[in-house]
């Protein structure tokens, strides 16, 4: 298969999966096989006339919209039944060398919406992009799923290349790094693997937490990190947790990740969520009333990915039902999502209440200055759960427990994390409290 088309289609699938019900996605979208691409048209293979009719009538808008977001181009879509229709010729074969960076064109600094939760991370990313290996090296970005870490990493890559196209920039997930290493070992191509990763100017590696516990991957990345750092090359890393909280990560890697600058990204506040939706509508020329965007932003507070997915669902619902977009229609379009999101709200308050109830304390005890073990131990568990079950930053967690310093929170999380590995009783306690919180 054409590698360029394969890359575009895989990214399109990821986008569509977040915008459709699981049944619809599995029934209709997963039956599609990308066939060919030229300057104007993408040909998609489908198994039968029935599938073709449904896709053309119900899902062509969604697919075209997703393709436009991924490729920044308006492709025509042609649904073909391979056994009946000749395959369109491929215009140009894609090679790794022609696009080594693997950067998503829609993730730039221009499309990034700055808010209170990401202002520091954005400033740090821009500083690194303006002066690779001279400002902060490595730059370590961390935060929950869908908060913009990957967007900032791609934005750095785009900016660097816009200033100096001759530089070698590579974005890769830790999973891809691991898989390529496995293949290199299997095929006896270790030297080719090392040459690829140690001869670039800017390495952007996403979701580094997944290499924890993979000894061979950690070993290889350790030497890759050293080679790049000693050659004065820029390294940008992302994770869902700060280095100290990544379980099973080797200490030598953890210490290196802390050499440069660590910046966290918190969930966006209401104003930022509204701004994100306005930006998306502007970029894609969508006509969405302001009160609808305010409604969506108020109801979907989890992360940016779900926020944009909710807007896409409203747009698709309007198109398919031929209804004007308004708040009532948005309520109908998002009813499944809103029902699920209302079920459980997990924040510091619900966690403190659950822990206090379990240990027969008052929530004020957890926020107090008392240091006796009957209070300090439950407090440490509550801090650990805040870190594990929410996207709160360390300083914010400290504030919620009587204004304690973030280092106290780090100590509590590390202690509970270590004790969980050695105590079956503590593991049962924590799991029971979690069930009480989630209603599981």
Curated annotation (Swiss-Prot):
A Gene Ontology biological process term: regulation of DNA replication
Region (Domain I, interacts with DnaA modulators) residue spans: 1-93
Superkingdom of origin organism: Bacteria
Positions that bind ATP: 146, 148-150
Xref: InterPro entries: AAA+_ATPase (IPR003593), Chromosome_initiator_DnaA (IPR001957), Chromosome_initiator_DnaA-like (IPR020591), Chromosome_initiator_DnaA_CS (IPR018312), DnaA_C (IPR013159), DnaA_dom (IPR013317), DnaA_N_dom (IPR024633), DnaA_N_sf (IPR038454)
Entry's family note: Belongs to the DnaA family.
Domain description: Domain I is involved in oligomerization and binding regulators, domain II is flexibile and of varying length in different bacteria, domain III forms the AAA+ region, while domain IV binds dsDNA.
Quaternary structure, from the entry: Oligomerizes as a right-handed, spiral filament on DNA at oriC.
PANTHER family, sorted: CHROMOSOMAL REPLICATION INITIATOR PROTEIN DNAA
Protein name from the UniProt record: Chromosomal replication initiator protein DnaA
């Amino acid at each position: 298969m054409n590698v360029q088309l394969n890359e575009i289609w895989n990214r399109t699938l990821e986008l569509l999966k977040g915008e459709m019900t699981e049944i619809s996605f599995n029934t209709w979208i997963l039956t599609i096989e990308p066939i060919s691409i030229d300057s104007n048209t993408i040909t998609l293979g489908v198994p039968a006339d029935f599938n073709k009719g449904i896709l053309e009538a119900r899902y062509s808008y969604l697919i075209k919209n997703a393709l436009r977001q991924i490729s920044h181009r308006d492709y025509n879509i042609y649904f073909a039944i391979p056994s009946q229709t000749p395959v369109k010729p491929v215009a140009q074969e894609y090679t790794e060398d022609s696009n080594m960076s693997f950067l998503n064109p829609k993730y730039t600094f221009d499309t990034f919406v700055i808010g209170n939760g990401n202002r520091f991370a954005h400033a740090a990313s821009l500083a690194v992009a303006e002066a690779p290996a001279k400002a902060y090296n490595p730059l370590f970005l961390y935060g929950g799923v869908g908060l913009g870490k990957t967007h900032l990493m791609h934005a750095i890559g785009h900016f660097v290349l816009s200033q100096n196209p001759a530089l070698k920039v590579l974005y890769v997930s830790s999973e891809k790094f691991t898989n390529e290493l496995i293949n290199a070992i299997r095929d006896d191509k270790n030297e080719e693997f090392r040459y690829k990763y140690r001869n670039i100017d800017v390495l952007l590696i996403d979701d580094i937490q997944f290499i924890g516990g993979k000894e061979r991957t950690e070993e290889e990345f350790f030497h890759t990190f050293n080679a790049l750092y000693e050659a004065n090359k820029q390294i940008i890393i992302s994770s869902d947790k700060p280095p100290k909280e990544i379980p099973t990560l080797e200490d030598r890697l953890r210490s290196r990740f802390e050499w440069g600058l660590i910046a966290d990204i918190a969930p966006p506040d209401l104003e930022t969520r509204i701004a994100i939706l306005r930006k998306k509508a502007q970029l894609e020329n969508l006509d969405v009333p302001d009160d609808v965007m305010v409604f969506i932003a108020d109801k979907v507070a989890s992360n940016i990915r779900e926020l944009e997915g909710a807007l896409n669902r409203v747009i698709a619902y309007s198109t398919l039902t031929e209804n004007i977009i308004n708040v009532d229609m948005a309520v109908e379009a998002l009813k499944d999502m809103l029902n699920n999101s209302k079920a459980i709200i997990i924040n510091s308050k619900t966690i403190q209440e659950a822990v206090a109830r379990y240990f027969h304390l008052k929530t004020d005890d957890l926020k107090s200055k008392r240091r006796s073990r009957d209070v300090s131990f439950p407090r440490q568990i509550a801090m650990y759960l805040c870190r594990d079950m929410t996207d709160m930053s360390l300083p914010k967690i400290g504030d919620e427990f009587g204004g304690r310093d973030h280092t106290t929170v780090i100590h509590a999380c590390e202690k509970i994390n270590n004790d969980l590995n050695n105590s079956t009783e503590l593991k049962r306690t924590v799991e029971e409290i979690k069930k009480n919180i989630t209603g599981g």
